[in-house]
């Protein structure tokens, strides 16, 4: 599906089709593992022009959907995109790379390795102005007033974004370990491009390398096991590492920025989408949109995953600890420990 558009969405929100196509073709870019990368020069040409646009006040208060991949972030973003005031960007990595090349951690556009964790000091000259210029141009073009920027790894860049924007807000989306790990593993196997060595972990494993080198040493559960983690090769183990460090980091951000970070559990979103979507709207300063809420009830469904992933004993122990912190008491029972 182009721009995550399907028949139901197009039928329910015909006026939103242009906004999604605009974001898809001119803001987001086509990263590694995706088709249509030949269009990227057009995207970058537009971004360079849009970045020079005059900024408006609404560009200072984007809402970021963060967490880890395969946790329901895309479907949440698409439901929020149905809100009359929202422009949804689905991992606009072309825009972020153009503003600061260190953003690219998977190797879609940069030959040089990026930064997984970014702080205020990592802002480069003109970066904030360029992003807000693109946001402003996009909001004016689409007649909306709130950017919803889904980019899971921005979880590791809250300091950076709080320095960049006056009033950013963050959704920390969590999903239980077993389902997330199984879903990530399945995606990797399905989408791997052997010829160019591209998969979930970037070009030639760049994302995995940076995760191990830059994030794991700072994690409270895995920092004493860096060499063990470095030697892991199974997809379920690597997915488990990403889940552990992402969830731990997200919990820290809630404590550090209690007024700026809202935790949403994927399971709660599936169980009562009305309540959770209204929480998000209230948090982001968006008015209630009944059509969006109805679409959420129709669209957000729990995906049952029957594959129970096998992980290294060190990771299994860490998963138990993190699951307890997150309130997922029974999740570890669905994790098989490698002998």
Predicted regions and their residues:
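Short active-site oxyanion
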Residues: 63, 144-147, 169
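Short catalytic/ligand-binding loop motif for oxyanion handling, primarily in non-cytosolic enzymes
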Residues: 74-77, 95-98, 155-158, 178-183, ...
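PAPS-dependent sulfotransferases, especially Golgi type II membrane carbohydrate sulfotransferases
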Residues: 1-63, 186, 193-195, 201, ...
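Short beta-strand segments
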Residues: 67, 147-150, 172-174, 263-266, ...
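Glycine-rich phosphate-binding P-loop
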Residues: 65-80
């Amino acid at each position: 599906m182009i721009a995550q558009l399907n028949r139901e969405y197009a039928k329910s929100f015909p006026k939103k089709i242009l906004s999604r196509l605009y974001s898809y073709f001119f803001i987001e870019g086509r990263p590694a593992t995706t088709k249509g990368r030949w269009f990227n020069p057009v995207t970058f040409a537009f971004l360079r022009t849009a970045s020079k646009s005059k900024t408006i006040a609404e560009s200072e208060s984007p809402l970021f959907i963060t967490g880890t991949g395969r946790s329901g972030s895309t479907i949440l973003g698409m439901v929020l995109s149905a809100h009359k005031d929202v422009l949804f960007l689905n991992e606009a990595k072309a825009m972020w790379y153009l503003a600061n090349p260190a953003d690219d951690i998977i190797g879609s556009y940069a030959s040089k390795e990026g930064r997984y964790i970014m702080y205020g000091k990592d802002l480069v000259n003109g970066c904030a102005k360029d992003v807000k210029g693109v946001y402003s141009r996009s909001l004016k073009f689409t007649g909306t007033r709130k950017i919803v920027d889904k980019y899971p790894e921005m979880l590791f860049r809250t300091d950076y974004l709080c320095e960049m924007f006056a009033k950013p807000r963050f959704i920390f989306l969590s999903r239980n370990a077993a389902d997330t790990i199984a879903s990530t593993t399945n995606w990797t196997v399905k989408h791997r491009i052997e010829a160019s060595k591209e998969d979930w972990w970037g070009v030639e494993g760049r994302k995995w390398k940076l995760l191990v080198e830059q994030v794991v040493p700072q994690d409270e559960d895995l920092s004493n096991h860096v060499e063990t983690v470095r030697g892991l090769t199974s997809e379920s183990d690597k997915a488990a590492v990403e889940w552990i460090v992402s969830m731990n980091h997200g919990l820290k951000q809630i404590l550090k920025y209690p007024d700026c970070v809202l935790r949403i559990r994927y399971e709660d979103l599936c169980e009562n989408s009305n309540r959770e979507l209204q929480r998000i709207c209230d948090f982001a300063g968006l008015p209630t949109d009944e059509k969006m809420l109805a679409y959420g009830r129709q669209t957000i469904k729990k995906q049952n995953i029957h594959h129970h992933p096998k992980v290294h004993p060190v990771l299994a122990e860490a998963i138990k600890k993190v699951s307890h912190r997150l309130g997922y008491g029974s999740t570890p029972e669905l994790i098989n420990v490698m002998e």
